[in-house]
A protein has these predicted regions:
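Active-site histidine-acidic residue metal-binding/catalytic motifs
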Residues: 2-71
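A short, glycine/acidic-enriched catalytic loop
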Residues: 22-35, 89-122
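Long, well-ordered alpha-helical scaffolding segments within enzyme catalytic domains
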Residues: 42, 46, 52, 109-124, ...
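Loop/turn elements at helix/coil->beta-strand transitions in domains of secreted/extracellular proteins
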Residues: 10-11, 51-57, 77-82, 122-126, ...
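Short, glycine/charged-enriched secondary-structure capping and boundary segments
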Residues: 28-31, 73-75, 96-99, 145-146, ...
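A short, hydrophobic beta-strand-centered structural micro-motif
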Residues: 71-87
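Active-site-adjacent mobile loop/cap segments within catalytic or ligand-binding domains
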Residues: 14, 20, 25, 82-87, ...
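Surface-exposed patches in mature extracellular/periplasmic domains of secreted proteins
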Residues: 58-64, 125-133
Length: 189
């Protein structure tokens, strides 16, 4: 029987695809004909399928422009793990994958490292590392207000030519890597 971070029998995961549904009013970062909201939604939906197939309970997969709504939904679902999927951007001058966790959360850091390792290994992206978000400095709302062990995955840079091609053609591989990272975490990475 599977054990989860809260000691229950099945790990419960809540997925959040970054930015507004259909890009209205905020599509997130854009580049090379891609919109962050679309890539994030596609990848999150694929992750949900892979996790379900692996016996992990997906208790939500929400895309909303309201971060409060996202956090409330995750907390109401009593999720053990919260994963927010995004794409990064930096005027085409950076590339790679990074995964954020709430600063000081050892479980969040462990989950982030499991996912980061899987993505970098599977897709060969530049490993920009695992980063801790500090409230008042670079605290990401979903990480600091979610009860679950929480991470925010920046898949790759949507405005970098090479990364954008991966985001366009390898969404399934990104999703598999995230799902593998979750199951690695469940097994203590």
């Amino acid at each position: 029987m599977r054990r989860n971070a809260k000691g229950g029998s099945t790990m419960k995961v809540f997925l959040n695809a970054g930015h507004a549904p259909d890009g209205n009013p905020d599509p997130g970062a854009c580049g090379y004909g891609l919109r962050e909201c679309d890539v994030a939604k596609n990848v999150a939906d694929l992750v949900a399928g892979y996790l379900t197939a692996a016996g992990v309970e997906v208790v939500g997969c929400l895309q909303s422009d309201s971060l409060r709504e996202v956090v409330s939904a995750s907390n109401r679902a009593d999720a053990d793990v919260f994963i927010s999927v995004h794409c990064n951007a930096c005027n085409g001058s950076a590339n790679g994958t990074e995964t954020w966790h709430y600063y000081g959360s050892t479980e969040g850091e462990k989950l982030a490292q499991c996912i980061q390792n899987q993505i970098a290994d599977a897709l060969g992206t530049v490993d920009r590392g695992v980063k801790g978000a500090k409230p008042g400095v670079n605290g990401l709302y979903v990480l600091s207000n979610t009860d679950a062990v929480a991470v925010l995955v920046e898949l790759a840079f949507i405005d970098h030519a090479g990364d954008a091609e991966l985001l366009r053609s390898q969404q399934d591989e990104f999703a598999r890597a995230i799902a593998c990272g979750v199951t690695d975490y469940e097994g203590a990475c």
